[in-house]
Amino acid sequence: PAQHHGRPYWLELLHRCALYAGVGSLVPMSMLGVPLSRSSALWRAAGLSFEEAVALHRALGHLMMGLLTFHAIGYMVAWLSESSEVLPDELTDWLRCGREHRCQHINNLAGLIAWLAGLLLWATSLRCFRRRRYDVFFIAHQLHFVFFGFGAIHWPTCICFAAPAVVFYTADLAMRLHVRVRVVATARAH
C-alpha cells in the first residue's frame, strides 16, 4: 500500500480531513455567538427577523458541531489505527505542550472536554428535547463558556475566530444589564 509520511495513504487522508473539518468549523463558530435577543439591533440591521436569526443560529450550530464531531472522531479513529498507545498519549499531552514537544500547542484533552461540552449543548438543543425541557436547554446553553474556553486551550488560534462573537455577546449583555439597571432605578424613583 502507498505510504505518506510513514502512514498508509488512507490514514494520512483521514488525518487531513479531520484537520480540515476542525479548521472549517471556525467559520460557523465565528458567527454562532452573535446574541439572539428580540431587541438585537444587529439582526435588525442585517434585515433578519428574530425567527430568521434563530433559524440561522441553529443551522450554524448544527454545521459547526457536525464538523467538530467529524474532527474529533476522525482523529480518534486515526490514532487508534496507528497504535493502541497513541490515543491515551495524545490525550495526556496536557502538560507536555510546547515548542520542544511534538504536540505543538495543540492540547487534545482540552479539545475533548470542549467537544463533550459541545455535544451536550447540541443534544439539548435538538427540537425533540428543547420543546419538552426548555429549562434544561436554556441552562445547558451556558456550556458555551466551557466549550469556547476549552476550545481556546485546545488551539489558541481559534480565539481569533471566536473574538467577534465574544465581543458581540459582551456588548449585548452590557446593553441588557444597562436597560435592567435603568428600569430598576426608574421604578425605585417612582
Map each language-model feature to its residues.
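FNR-like FAD-binding dehydrogenase module
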Residues: P1-H190
